[in-house]
UniProtKB/Swiss-Prot annotation:
The protein's role, per its UniProt record: Inhibits all the catalytic activities of DNA gyrase by preventing its interaction with DNA. Acts by binding directly to the C-terminal domain of GyrB, which probably disrupts DNA binding by the gyrase.
Subunit description: Interacts with GyrB.
Required co-factors: Zn(2+)
A GO molecular-function annotation: DNA topoisomerase type II (double strand cut, ATP-hydrolyzing) inhibitor activity
Cofactor note as given: Binds 1 zinc ion.
Annotated organism of origin: Pasteurella multocida (strain Pm70)
The protein's name: DNA gyrase inhibitor YacG
């Protein structure tokens, strides 16, 4: 086993984060950055790309986008 410290940039602020049990919010540097990211997903500012947003809908499902 090596003693190399693996670190990654925080997706929000780019601060280097040690990838270990010492960093409970990894890959984020802190709870604040973690919550900012969650808020971006909740506000649909971030999304997983796909061909069409209604690919899973069929005739029996209600169109939730109209609400």
């Amino acid at each position: 086993m090596t003693d190399d410290i693996f670190s990654v940039p925080c997706p929000i602020c780019q601060k280097q984060v040690e990838w270990s049990d010492k960093s409970p919010f990894r890959p984020f540097c802190c709870k604040r950055c973690q919550l900012i990211d969650l808020g971006e997903w909740a506000a649909e500012e971030k999304a997983i790309p796909c061909e069409s947003a209604d690919f899973a809908m069929n005739d029996e499902q209600e169109d939730w986008r109209a609400h």
